[in-house]
Amino acid sequence: MKKKLLALVCALALTFSFAGCTISTPDTVGSIGDFEITSGMYLLAQYGAYQQAAQLAGSDQDASDVKAFLKETITTDSDSGETAVVSDYVAQQTQQTLETLAAVDARFKALGGELTAEQLSTADRYAQQMMDQYGDTYTANGIGLETVKAYERLQVEHTALLDMVYGPDGETPV
């Protein structure tokens, strides 16, 4: 009887411990400096890197077979003949994209940059257009509207940063 009661208590405890468990993507996957990398932003950068690799694929390579394509070798520079394994190329390009976004955001903030309501609206409209056009693909890859908005806002920051640094009233006018 005691063993049955103990087994029941253990089963209930186990059941309750699993009740709150769900498998989900974490909100953030890391940071570069003060720049928090959301899971969506990481996935968007990775998706973009994979698409770049697909553009570099030879005619005999099938980028739609992801598992096989990641093991393939692509030519990354036709002039030098430099090659890379797709999985390595995607990892490197993903990292490079995230580092660039972090650097843009940090520099924009360091120079006191703030996006105007018009700039935010433009970025958000473009993000919605991107979701209207590619939403099924983005959603299937774990990328939502808020991620695309954040990415497009960073692109607007990038454009504004160029003017803040090199514009007529910039830090280093050209």
Give the location of each predicted region.
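Short, low-structural-confidence N-terminal segments
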Residues: 1-88, 92
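Peptidyl-prolyl cis-trans isomerase
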Residues: 34, 68-174
